[in-house]
Amino acid sequence: MAGDRPPTPFCSMTSNEKNVKVKIFAVLVRGEDDEVERDNVRIACEGVMRLEDGRVEIVYEETLGEEGTAINTLSFSVEEPNVVTLARDGAASCVMTFSENCRYRGTYHMGYLSFDFTVATRRVENSVRFDKGGVLILDYNTEMQGVSIQNSKFRFTITA
C-alpha cells in the first residue's frame, strides 16, 4: 500500500539537487573452489543527487524482490571522494563504509533478524561530481566472523 512506503525522494528540486539516472552493474561471487556461485546484477533507476555542506548524496530506490524495496543513499565528501558510505533503509537495512584497503564493521537488519558483518574494501574509484555525474567503482569482500561470504564488484554510473 502506498501509505506504507517511505516518501519518494524525487520531489521539489532545489539548486543543490537534481534528478539523475543511476545505472548499476554488479558481479557478486559466493563460495569457493567447485562451489562458486556467480551473479551479474543490472539495475537502472531514477534518483536524486544533492550537494550540501561539502557532501554529495545520491538517493535511489531499489526493489529487493520478495523482501520489498529499499531507499539507498550513496554519499561522500567532495574533499575525500574515495571514502564512500552506502546507507540502505527498508526491508533490509544497513550502513556500509568503503575506503580502499580498509575494513569497516556493520550490522544488517532484516526485520526480526540482525547480523554483524565486515566490509573489506579492495578498491574505490570515484569520478562522480555534482555538476557532471560520473562513475563510482566499489570492489569489496563481505565477511561474517572472519569468513568471506561474498566478493562484490559494483559500477555505478550517474548521469543527469
What is each residue range found by the language model?
Residues 1-13:
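N-terminal amphipathic/basic-hydrophobic helices that include classical n-h-c signal peptides
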Residues 10-60:
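Long, hydrophobic N-terminal alpha-helical segment
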Residues 15, 49-53, 77-80, 109-112, ...:
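A short, structured loop/turn motif at beta-sheet edges
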Residues 17-21, 52-59, 83-85, 103, ...:
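Short, hydrophobic/aromatic-rich segments at coil-to-beta transitions
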Residues 40-94:
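Short, well-structured hydrophobic secondary-structure segments
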Residues 46-49, 73-76, 106, 123-125, ...:
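Hydrophobic/aromatic beta-strand elements that line small-molecule binding cavities or substrate pockets
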Residues 90-135:
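Acidic, glycine-rich flexible loop segments
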Residues 129-160:
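Mixed-charge, glycine-accented linear interaction segment located at domain edges/termini
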